[in-house]
């Protein structure tokens, strides 16, 4: 019975060191070519609350919404 508890404690200590955990936890956006196009569009058109488009998921989502609202036919 003690082995699973010890194993869980070891895993909890190691997990923050893993690269995948850090990416998930930080919620940072890796800005690829498409992301860069959206962010440049938002910068050029002074979209509000998208200043951190390249690094913040929430700002990036706002930028995509701004882009689609202004560029998709209705």
Swiss-Prot record:
Molecular function per GO: ion channel regulator activity; toxin activity
Top-level lineage group: Eukaryota
GO cellular component: extracellular region
Residues excised as propeptide: 21-28
Location of this chain's protein in the cell: Secreted
Tissue localization of expression: Expressed by the venom duct.
Residues making up the signal peptide according to the UniProt record: 1-20
Keyword flag Signal: yes
Keywords: Disulfide bond, Ion channel impairing toxin, Neurotoxin, Secreted, Signal, Toxin
Processing and modification events after translation: Contains 3 disulfide bonds.
Task performed by this protein: Acts as a neurotoxin by inhibiting an ion channel.
Similarity field: Belongs to the conopeptide P-like superfamily.
Record remark on domains: The cysteine framework is IX (C-C-C-C-C-C).
Protein name: Turripeptide OL135
